[in-house]
Amino acid sequence: MNYMDTPFTGIHSYVVSVSPGRSRANHYHEKKEEWIALAAGTAALHLVDIKKGERESMVLDTRSADYGLIYISPFIAHSIENVGNGEAAVIVFSRTPEDPSDTIPFRFDI
């Protein structure tokens, strides 16, 4: 295969670590889709649909057999809160690179 002739579309990923009692993310995107997976620890994922005002929270725990990949669509504000005693880590996947102009801060009242 000649990679010069074939367009390459990849997956962008990064790891976010969260200390106990802290929260990370606290934003939404107007264009970007993300998928997240808990890699370590126990964390609460807080979601708010910006357009509908609907809220949802769930606890993710790597010791649980039923956690997996979670899809976050545009206009869904998201926050990861470490509710465990040790460090938590989340892997974030996206089809597009990070765009600071598409990361809109959102205040969560948790």
Residue ranges: model-predicted function:
Residues 69-76:
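Conserved SET/PR-domain catalytic core that frames the SAM/AdoMet-binding pocket
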Residues 1-69, 81-110:
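Non-catalytic, conserved peripheral segments adjacent to functional cores
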